[in-house]
Amino acid sequence: YNQLEDTTAMYRGGLECLKYFPNEPLPYVMISLPLLIRKDLERAKGYLEQGLALSPDNSPIKAQFFAYLGEVYYKQDRVEQAFAMFDSTLLINPGDIMTLNNYSYYLSLRNEHLDKAEKMISTALSADPNNSTFLDTYAWVLFKSKNYSLAKFYMRSAIENEKNPSGVLYEHYGDILFMNGEKEEAVKMWQKALEFRDEECGDLKYKIENGLPVDHEK
């Protein structure tokens, strides 16, 4: 459900379903996921909380509500609550690979609990070893753990396994190459990343102009 028309159809279907099954949790998933994708976070949270209250304890759908609430909270910068939701998801469904990936990546961005992050993304990769998103996350966890040579291997694999690599992948690869001493190649990757980025790219432009990451000591 990444296409706008699909999310619209899902949202409308959820509203229709809710008319007939107001006490079932499924319609609330159908409504809240499109809202989450559209970043209508408060409305998504409202439906998720209603659906969560209707979900049987320790059920797969309850785990799903916890996971989506975690995403809402994280996007609202309510990090502790987000991570508590992800922990609740994984207590019910330890093999939820999307939660394992996202939780791991968020921890790496905050440079927190990197051992836990590595275990989670390793589990996700075991289930889907050619998933470029998971490979990117694993590479980034390794990068934050200062395991630069292994990070390079996994980031290269992430790019090779993605038909249309994003600017984020190339930027990550540039950062990793830089820390492996390959500064010229790093700048090339940052330049390539800039071609794919539409939003504000101040940090990326700094890297290209100065030949080093923003927080790197000269």
Model-derived features with residue positions:
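Residue-level detector of the short coil/turn that links helix A to helix B
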Residues: 5, 39, 77, 111-112, ...
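Canonical tetratricopeptide repeat
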Residues: 30, 64, 68, 102, ...
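Residue-level recognition of tetratricopeptide repeat
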Residues: 33, 71, 105-106, 140, ...
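Structural marker of alpha-solenoid helical repeat scaffolds
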Residues: 20, 54-58, 92, 127, ...
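TPR alpha-solenoid repeat register
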Residues: 27, 61, 65, 99, ...
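Position-specific recognition of the canonical hydrophobic site in helix A of tetratricopeptide repeat
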Residues: 2, 36, 67, 74, ...
